[in-house]
C-alpha cells in the first residue's frame, strides 16, 4: 500500500470542551479557564502508512503542563516515578494481531508497542473498534479515524483539542439542518486541595418538575429531560451526560433539534444536536477504554454517570469504606457492559421529571480563591484537573483577555492561516509577519525551520514538543506546527520528520496531501533539495536557527555567570567533583579521557547496577554516598570543598513523553531541588575566589513552565545540545551551568563515531546512518515507521548489540558488562546515561583550570 500517513485522533475528551458562541457564523473570542491535556495514543498501522491520535496544537503545550494534577487526585494508579505511565489494574489489554499481514497493532499496554490494529484510512473513514456496531445512530468523524495506541477492544477516541479559536461544529462531516450549536462552560480553575477534598463530588442533578417546561424538546427528536446519554461533538470523544432543561443552564432555550446536556464529571453545559446523542445504554459501543486508562476525569465521569444509572435502576453493589475509585467502578462497569441487567436500558429512564442543578449542593467558582493557570485565559477546555472541581456550579460566562495579549484587543491580530497564506502568495504580506503555525499576526519569535514566525502560544508548544519522539523514532507532532491530526511520515530512514495534512493543504497547496499519500517513497520538505514549496519555504540556515531558537528562549534575563580567568599551569591542581544522580560515572570517564587529574570524585547514586559499573570500571576511585536526599550540609563540608558539581535529576516526571508525569514539584521531579540546595552548600564561601563550576542536565521535551522554573532557581538559561552532532544517535538535552563556552558550537572530533556503521562489529552492515533516540525501552532500537531492524548480518536483520550501543553513546566497549547483567539491564543503564561526546564538549574548557596528566 502506498503513502505514509499518520492519522491523529482529533477526539477530545469532553473535559476538553471549548466555550464558543456563534454569532453570524463566527466564533466569538471566548477566554478559557481550564487548560487542555495532552493524551497521545498510537493506532494501527498499514504498511507504508501510519496513524496516530494526537492532540491539536494549542492544547498540546498546556495539556502536558497539568498531568501532575491529572494524576495527583489520590487515585494512586498514575504516578510512581516510572518511565512509563502506570495504567489502572482494572482493564489491562493484550495485543492482538490483525488477520492481515499488512496491518499491525500497537497498544500502549501490550507486550509489544510496535504493532497496531488499524483499518485502512482509505477504506474506512469512521472510527472503528472491535465492538463497533453498524446500527449505531452516530457517524464517526472522518478525519480522525484512527488512534495512537488504540485499544483493541472498543472504539476509543482520544483527545485531540482543536485550535483556541475553534467554532465547534457538531455535524461530524454530515449535514446538520438544525442550526449551529452553542457550548457553554464555566470559568473556573481548581485549587490543589480540590483534587484531594473534592473526592468524587460532582454537581448534583435532581428531579424537579417545577423547573421544567412541558413543551420543551417537542421537536420529534429523541431524548428528553433527564435522559442519560453519550454526547458527541466534532473533535471530541464520547462523554456521558444528562439532558437538562435550558433553565438549568442560565442560557436561552435550545434550538429545534438541539439538546442542552450537562456533562458528568465537571457539570459544564453544552448545546448538542440530538443526532449526536446516543443512549447511555449503548455502553460497550461508546465506552473508551484508552481514555479510561489515561484520564482521571474520565474515570470520575464514568463513576458519576453509572452512579446515577445505578440509583435509577435500583441496583446495589457491595462496597466498603476504604474502597478506591477503581474498586467502586469495577462492578459498575461490569454491570454496564453486561447490559444494565436486570432492568436493562428501560431502568435508566427518568420518571418524567425535570433534572436541575441542586443549588444547595454546589459551590460557585467565585466562592473561593482560584488557582492561577498559565493557560487559564487561553483555552476553555475540560482537562483532568476539572474533574476535581466537579462540585462547582457553572457560573455565567465572562470574556477574558488572552494571557499573551498584553491587554490589547486581539481582533486585529486574528486571522486564519489560509488568509495568511493567500496574502503571502499574492505578495500582500510577508511570511515573517504571521505565525506559520496558526496564522496569527504579530508573531513574537521566528520559526526555526521555515520562513515565518511563531506566536507566543505556538512558540511555547514548539519548545515543549519539537523534540518529543514516538516509539518508532518519528517526531510526535508536525514539524511545522507541532500538532496535526493526520501526519505524513518521511520515507528516508535517517529522517524523523513528519508533516500534517493541514499544513500541506494550506501552505503547500490544495491536493498536496492526497498526492503525497500516493507517493512511495515520500520525501519530506526537510529532505527535498528544493527549498520552496508553495509558501512553505525552508530556511537556508535552519540548523543554526534551530539551535538559536532553543537557546534564545530566555524567559527572564539573568546576570552573566562569573567568568574565572584561566589558571597558570604551575598553579593548577586536581579537580574535586560532586556528582549527583551519577548514573554510570560518565562524568568521571570524561574527565579521565580529557586527561584532567581527579583529586576526589564523590558520587550519589541509588541504582546498584550503576554503582557496580562505576566501581568496577574505575577501580574504586569513586566514593559512593547513596541517596541524594540523605546528604546534609555537614556532609558537604566533610567531603569538600568541591570544584565541580554536576547532575541530572530523573526526567520521568518532567518529560512530556510520560502522560502520567507529575511535574517539577511532585514525584521524582522534586529531586531537582535536592541538586539545587546541595549546589548552594558546595559554593565557595564569600571571599573565596577559587574557580567553581557546576552543570545540571535534563530533557528538552519538558513543560515550558518547568523549564523556566528550573532556570529561575539556577539563575541562568540553558543551552540545548543534540548528540546527533557528535554521535550516531539523536539525544537532545538541556544543560544549565557556568562552564566556560557552554553555548559555543558543537564540533565533532576525529575520534567521534558519527555514523552507525562506525559503531558496528565486524561483518555487520548498518541500514541507516543515524538512529533515533535510544531509551531504556527495547523497542527504541527499531527504526522508522515500519520498525525496521537497524543492522543486517549474514543476510539477516538484527538489533544493535550492547557493545554497539556503548559505542553509539561514546563509552568504551564492554563498559556496562559487569555483574552478569543481561542485555535489557545494560540498555537501561545506557538509556539513562549522558552522551560521552557531549559531556566531553562541555568539560573540555576545564583543562585550563585544573591539573592534567
Curated annotation (Swiss-Prot):
The keyword GTP-binding does not apply. Its EC number is 2.1.1.37. S-adenosyl-L-methionine binds at residues 582-586, 605, 627-629, 832-834. The modification Phosphothreonine is found at residue 96. One of its GO terms (molecular function) is zinc ion binding. The modification Citrulline is found at residue 410. Residues 435-527 are annotated as: Interaction with the PRC2/EED-EZH2 complex. Sumoylated. The active site is at 651. A zinc finger (GATA-type) spans 434-464. Keywords: Activator, Citrullination, Disease variant, DNA-binding, Isopeptide bond, Metal-binding, Methyltransferase, Nucleus, Phosphoprotein, Repressor, S-adenosyl-L-methionine, Transferase, Ubl conjugation, Zinc, Zinc-finger. Gene3D superfamilies: 2.30.30.140, PWWP, helical domain, Vaccinia Virus protein VP39. Residues 575-853 form the SAM-dependent MTase C5-type domain. Residues 179-199 have a biased composition (Polar residues). Residues 423-555 form the ADD domain. Interacts with BAZ2A/TIP5, SUV39H1 and CBX4. Interacts with UHRF1. Interacts with DNMT1 and DNMT3A, SETDB1, UBL1, UBE2I9 and ZHX1. Interacts with the PRC2/EED-EZH2 complex. This is DNA (cytosine-5)-methyltransferase 3B. It comes from Homo sapiens (Human). The gene is DNMT3B.
Amino acid at each position: 500500500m502506498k503513502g505514509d500517513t499518520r492519522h491523529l485522533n482529533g477526539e477530545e475528551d469532553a473535559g476538553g470542551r471549548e466555550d464558543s458562541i456563534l454569532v453570524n457564523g463566527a466564533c466569538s473570542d471566548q477566554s478559557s479557564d481550564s487548560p487542555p491535556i495532552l493524551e497521545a495514543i498510537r493506532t494501527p498501522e498499514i504498511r507504508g502508512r501510519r496513524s496516530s491520535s494526537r492532540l491539536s496544537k494549542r492544547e498540546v503545550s498546556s495539556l502536558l503542563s497539568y498531568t501532575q494534577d491529572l494524576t495527583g487526585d489520590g487515585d494512586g494508579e498514575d504516578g510512581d516515578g516510572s518511565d512509563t505511565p502506570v495504567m489502572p489494574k482494572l482493564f489491562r489489554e493484550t495485543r492482538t494481531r490483525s488477520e492481515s499481514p499488512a496491518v499491525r497493532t500497537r497498544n500502549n499496554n501490550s507486550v509489544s508497542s510496535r504493532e497496531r490494529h488499524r483499518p485502512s484510512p482509505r477504506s474506512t473513514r469512521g472510527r472503528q473498534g472491535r465492538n463497533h456496531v453498524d446500527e449505531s445512530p452516530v457517524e464517526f468523524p472522518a478525519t480522525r479515524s484512527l488512534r495512537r495506541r488504540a485499544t483493541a477492544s472498543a472504539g476509543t477516541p482520544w483527545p485531540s483539542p482543536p485550535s483556541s479559536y475553534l467554532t465547534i461544529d457538531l455535524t461530524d462531516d454530515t449535514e446538520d439542518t438544525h442550526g449551529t450549536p452553542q457550548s457553554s462552560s464555566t470559568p473556573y480553575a481548581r485549587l490543589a486541595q480540590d483534587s484531594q477534598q473534592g473526592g468524587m463530588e460532582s454537581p448534583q442533578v435532581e428531579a424537579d418538575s417545577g423547573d421544567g417546561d412541558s413543551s420543551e424538546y417537542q421537536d420529534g427528536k429523541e431524548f428528553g429531560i433527564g435522559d442519560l446519554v453519550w454526547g458527541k461533538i466534532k473533535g471530541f470523544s464520547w462523554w456521558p451526560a444528562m439532558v437538562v432543561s435550558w433553565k438549568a443552564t442560565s442560557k436561552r432555550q435550545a434550538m429545534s433539534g438541539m439538546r442542552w446536556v450537562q456533562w458528568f464529571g465537571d457539570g459544564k453545559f453544552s448545546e448538542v444536536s440530538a443526532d449526536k446523542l446516543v443512549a447511555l445504554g449503548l455502553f460497550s459501543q461508546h465506552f473508551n477504554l484508552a481514555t479510561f486508562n489515561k484520564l482521571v476525569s474520565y474515570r470520575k465521569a464514568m463513576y458519576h454517570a453509572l452512579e446515577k444509572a445505578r440509583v435509577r435502576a435500583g441496583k446495589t453493589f457491595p462496597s466498603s469504606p476504604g474502597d478506591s475509585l477503581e474498586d467502586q467502578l469495577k462492578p459498575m462497569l461490569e454491570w454496564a457492559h453486561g447490559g444494565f441487567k436486570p432492568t436493562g436500558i428501560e431502568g435508566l429512564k427518568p420518571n418524567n421529571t425535570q433534572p436541575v442543578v441542586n443549588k444547595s449542593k454546589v459551590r460557585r467558582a467565585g466562592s473561593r480563591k482560584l488557582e492561577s493557570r498559565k493557560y487559564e485565559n487561553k483555552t476553555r477546555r475540560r482537562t483532568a484537573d476539572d474533574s476535581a472541581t466537579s462540585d462547582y456550579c457553572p457560573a455565567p460566562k465572562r470574556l477574558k483577555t488572552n494571557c499573551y495579549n498584553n491587554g490589547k484587543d486581539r481582533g486585529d491580530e486574528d486571522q486564519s492561516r489560509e488568509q495568511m497564506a493567500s496574502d503571502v502568495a499574492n505578495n500582500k504580506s510577508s511570511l515573517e509577519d504571521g505565525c506559520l503555525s496558526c496564522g496569527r499576526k504579530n508573531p513574537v519569535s521566528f520559526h526555526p525551520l521555515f520562513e515565518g514566525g511563531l506566536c507566543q502560544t505556538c512558540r511555547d508548544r514548539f519548545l515543549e514538543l519539537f523534540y518529543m519522539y514516538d516509539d518508532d523514532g518519528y517526531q510526535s507532532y508536525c514539524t511545522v506546527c507541532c500538532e496535526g491530526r493526520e501526519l505524513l511520515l518521511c520515507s528516508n530512514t535517517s529522517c524523523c520528520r513528519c508533516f500534517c495534512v493541514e499544513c500541506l493543504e494550506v501552505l503547500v497547496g490544495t491536493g498536496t496531501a492526497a498526492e503525497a499519500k500516493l507517493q512511495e517513497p515520500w520525501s519530506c520538505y526537510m529532505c527535498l533539495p528544493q527549498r520552496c514549496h508553495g509558501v512553505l519555504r525552508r530556511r537556508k540556515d535552519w540548523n543554526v536557527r534551530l539551535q538559536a531558537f532553543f537557546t534564545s528562549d530566555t524567559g527572564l534575563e539573568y546576570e552573566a555567570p562569573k567568568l574565572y580567568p584561566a589558571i597558570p599551569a604551575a598553579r593548577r591542581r586536581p579537580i574535586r567533583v560532586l556528582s549527583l544522580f551519577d548514573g554510570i560515572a560518565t562524568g568521571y570517564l570524561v574527565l579521565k579521557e580529557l586527561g584532567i587529574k581527579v583529586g576526589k570524585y564523590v558520587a550519589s547514586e541509588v541504582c546498584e547496577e550503576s554503582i557496580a559499573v562505576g566501581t568496577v570500571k574505575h577501580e574504586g576511585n569513586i566514593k559512593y554516598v547513596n541517596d541524594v536526599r540523605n546528604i546534609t550540609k555537614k556532609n558537604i563540608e566533610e567531603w569538600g570543598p568541591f570544584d565541580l558539581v554536576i547532575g541530572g535529576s530523573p526526567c520521568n516526571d518532567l518529560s512530556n513523553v510520560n502522560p502520567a508525569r507529575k511535574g517539577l514539584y511532585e514525584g521524582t521531579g522534586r529531586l531537582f531541588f535536592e541538586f539545587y540546595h546541595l549546589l548552594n552548600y558546595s559554593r565557595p564561601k564569600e571571599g573565596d575566589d577559587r574557580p567553581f563550576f557546576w552543570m545540571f542536565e535534563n530533557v528538552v521535551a519538558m513543560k515550558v513552565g518547568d523549564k523556566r522554573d528550573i532556570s529561575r532557581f539556577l539563575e541562568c538559561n540553558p543551552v540545548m545540545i543534540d548528540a546527533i552532532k557528535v554521535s550516531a544517535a539523536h539525544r537532545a538535552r538541556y544543560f544549565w551551568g557556568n562552564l566556560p563556552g557552554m553555548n559555543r558550537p558543537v564540533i565533532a572530533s576525529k575520534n567521534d563515531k558519527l555514523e552507525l556503521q562506525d559503531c558496528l562489529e565486524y561483518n555487520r552492515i548498518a541500514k541507516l546512518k543515524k538512529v533515533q533516540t535510544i531509551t531504556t525501552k527495547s523497542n527504541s532500537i527499531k527504526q522508522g515507521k515500519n520498525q525496521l531492524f537497524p543492522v543486517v548480518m549474514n543476510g539477516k536483520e538484527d538489533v544493535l548489540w550492547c557493545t554497539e550501543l556503548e559505542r553509539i553513546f561514546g563509552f568504551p566497549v564492554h563498559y556496562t558488562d559487569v555483574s552478569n547483567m543481561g542485555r535489557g539491564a545494560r540498555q537501561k543503564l545506557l538509556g539513562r546515561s549522558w552522551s560521552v561526546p557531549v559531556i566531553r564538549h562541555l568539560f573540555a574548557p576545564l583543562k585550563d583550570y585544573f591539573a592534567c596528566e
